């Protein structure tokens, strides 16, 4: 369901936009989310006059669980557009159509809330291992069994592996189901930059109930792992040379595809954006065989060499939560894309307490990606 808010009030530097959304009864028996991107400024989200969230980052897409705030019938979903309290660290976002790709969606109360996936070489380098973790959720108030599973097809279309598992989840909570099957023949389908058509495996995540499939989630992943060995960047045990180009997605997918192809034709194999990009940007890089060093929306060159507490935004403890929030948002959005080989904590920014805490967090959650600043 599209979310296309219109202005309805203004006060000082703030503008209120909103839309009255008709929520059908069937949605009230599920879990409802609002996806927001291309807002262009900081905002406060309210639903039926209840505050849901305050967001200072104008560039990174975000999702919000609205189930506690909505009801059957008409619902007023509003955004108060305002100046960011963290303007000092914002990169300048690309100009895109306001509120493009904002929408609401629903899932059943027994569904897939999140996942992590990678197809990497095993310890012998002879085969691949699918490292898959599915976070299943139970939106009911009581224990419920939830069955989740997957299948994986080779780039040539052959079914390679299929499995599912049932787990009983307490009410209003989640549980993680892990699968680690060997995938044979992967060395014939290496995902590497420079290839004309880099091979991608097709994976389908699903939930099942009473013998019927209830939810499908199609994915594409490439085989490989980028590692730092003795100070050398390697992939498939060969030293990797990155030819980098700074680039942010254009206003639309078609233009971005043409520009990425042009960058690749010039010999570039690594794209370095200034802040998190639209979801389809990473899809294009997966398909084209371009590495991406993703970047959090942190750009704080102000007094970057000042080592005093508060001397630079990166060493101002009052901003530590905002730094962490932005690094987390970057990581969770793009971590499952084969093209993403590293995460940058930000653009031109000084060092300090906030950067250190962000680095610590990123290191604690990801061992398959490199970290940069």
Located regions from the model:
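Conserved small/polar residues in nucleotide/adenosyl-binding loops
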Residues: 368-373
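Active-site groove signature of glycoside hydrolases
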Residues: 326-351
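Aromatic- and acidic-residue-enriched carbohydrate-binding clefts of CAZyme catalytic domains
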Residues: 245, 295-323, 327
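Generic structural signal for well-ordered alpha-helices
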Residues: 260, 282, 327-331, 355-359
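Alpha-helical scaffolding within the catalytic cores
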Residues: 228-231, 279, 314, 322-331
């Amino acid at each position: 369901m599209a979310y296309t808010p219109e202005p309805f009030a203004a006060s000082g530097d703030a503008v209120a936009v909103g839309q009255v959304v008709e929520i059908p009864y069937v949605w009230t028996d599920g879990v409802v989310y609002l996806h927001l991107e291309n807002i262009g400024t900081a905002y406060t989200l309210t639903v039926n006059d209840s505050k849901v969230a305050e967001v200072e980052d104008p560039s990174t897409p975000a999702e919000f669980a609205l189930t506690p705030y909505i009801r059957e019938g008409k619902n007023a979903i509003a955004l108060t557009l305002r100046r960011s309290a963290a303007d000092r660290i914002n990169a300048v976002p690309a100009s895109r159509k306001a509120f493009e790709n904002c929408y609401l969606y629903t899932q059943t109360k027994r569904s897939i809330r999140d996942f992590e996936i990678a197809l990497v070489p095993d310890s012998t380098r002879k085969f691949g291992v699918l490292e898959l973790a599915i976070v299943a959720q139970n939106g009911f108030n009581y224990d419920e069994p939830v069955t989740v599973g997957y299948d994986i097809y080779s780039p040539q279309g052959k079914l390679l592996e299929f499995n599912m598992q049932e787990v009983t989840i307490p009410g209003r909570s989640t549980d993680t189901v892990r699968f680690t099957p060997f995938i044979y023949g992967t060395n014939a389908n290496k995902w590497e930059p420079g290839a004309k058509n880099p091979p991608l495996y097709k994976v389908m995540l699903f939930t099942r109930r009473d013998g019927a499939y209830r939810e499908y989630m199609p994915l594409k992943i490439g085989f490989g792992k980028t590692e730092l060995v003795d100070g050398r960047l390697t992939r498939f045990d060969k030293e990797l040379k990155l030819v980098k180009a700074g680039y942010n997605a254009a206003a639309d997918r078609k233009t971005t595809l043409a520009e990425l192809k042009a960058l690749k034709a010039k010999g570039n194999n690594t794209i370095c954006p200034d802040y998190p990009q639209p979801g389809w940007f990473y899809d294009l890089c997966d398909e084209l065989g371009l590495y991406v060093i993703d970047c959090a929306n942190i750009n704080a060159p102000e007094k970057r060499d000042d080592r005093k507490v508060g001397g630079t935004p990166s060493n101002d403890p009052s901003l530590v939560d905002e730094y962490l929030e932005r690094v987390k948002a970057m990581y969770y959005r793009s971590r499952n894309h084969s093209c993403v080989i590293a995460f940058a904590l930000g653009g031109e920014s000084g060092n300090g307490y906030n950067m250190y805490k962000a680095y610590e967090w990123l290191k604690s959650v990801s061992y398959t990606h490199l970290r940069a600043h």
